[in-house]
Amino acid sequence: MNKIFLLFFALILLNSATFAQIKKSKKEKNQNVETVITDSVQWRKDHYVINRDSAYADPRIGLKKLMGGNRRFVEGKSIRPRQDAETIKKLEKGQEPFATIVGCSDSRVPNEMIFDQGLGDLFIIRTAGQVSAAASYGSMEFAVLKLKTKLIVVLGHTECGAVAAAVSRPEDVPGHIVTLINEIKQSVAKSSYLPGDPVNNAVRQNVIDQVMTLRDLDPILHKI
């Protein structure tokens, strides 16, 4: 699918060079422009591309943009947007991420990659098991108040090591790791009666519990 992406842009560049070298009638030019526009619309549809400004303005559209990006990633259609020099230059003046992701630190779940988003698109807060505390809440509030992000996504994932540790109930847990496990234990207990994989069941419950906690926070995150 990457070849399709490159071919699309190569076609535009080729047309531009041709227009500069060959005189054509106004009618022929309009036909070429219409063809490019049609190709562009079809390409965006095939790759589930959603306008970024719309995603920033409306959290429902923002969620669709994330889901479309994840679908591209799963289907091998990743386009890796907003990684060019022009975007980097613009971001020197500030950032306007359309979503805040509260996710796990697991190295197998890089948020920009699995959602196929670019620089400045996502404000990301990551801890093991996406366990949140005061610093995480403050980071979310910063995203909402200062960056005007309207969408907060709590992202869990299968085979989470932190949740697996809580499910196994280890003894003599060293250091601050015990803090993570204790925070997840209640989710493990709530999901223990469910059929299926106990770790993945606890992962889902952990996400639900964290969302409910965020909704109860006053006064800033409660408004989301």
Where do the language-model regions lie?
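Bacterial Sec-dependent N-terminal signal peptides
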Residues: 1-25
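Divalent-metal-activated hydrolytic enzyme cores
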Residues: 22-94, 120, 130-138, 142-147, ...
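Divalent metal-coordination and catalytic microenvironments
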Residues: 66, 101, 125, 154
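Catalytic-core segments of thiol-dependent peptidases
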Residues: 92-93, 100, 157-158
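Active-site alpha/beta core segments
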Residues: 95-100, 106-112
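Short glycine-enriched loops at secondary-structure junctions
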Residues: 103-108, 128-131, 157
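Catalytic core of membrane glycerolipid acyltransferases/transacylases, capturing the structured
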Residues: 108-125
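Short acidic/polar active-site loop segments enriched in Thr and Asp
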Residues: 150
